[in-house]
Amino acid sequence: AVQMVHEYLIYENLLNHLIDIGGEIIVSGSNNEKPWAVGIQNPLSQSDDASVIIKNNNNFLAIASSGEYRNYKSNRNGEKITHTINPNTLESIKNNILSVTVVHETSATYADAYSTAFNAMGSELAMDTANNNDIALMLIIQSDNKINIIYSDKWYDLVK
């Protein structure tokens, strides 16, 4: 949906815009001649404070995040049951990823698909896949009761 709204705005020659539909975001052009700024929330925070700020450079960026930190239930054993299913086990994913964010240069559809796939893969395979395919990826992971933010190589090129 966000991609279609963007394409319509471009068709109408409305080049400067930020669109957010359900956490899928497109920024295009500028915000009164300044970069658009999009904050990525800390998944463990109850506030809306951002952990990372993404700014565009008067260009198009599609941003999609995926995570299991809000939309889950617990079973009788206290284990998380999430809405993302591991395609290999056909069970709810179980990994150390709290949040996945993908920034794509051309497509919100790709950003959304990659963020969901990386969430299901787990952190090591996701980061290897992103680096091998030149994809801008940020993972917020929890390990040993610590929160770490890790980035793919492309993230540093695209998100400055």
What do the predicted segments below correspond to?
Residues 1-160:
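Mature catalytic core of soluble alpha/beta enzymes
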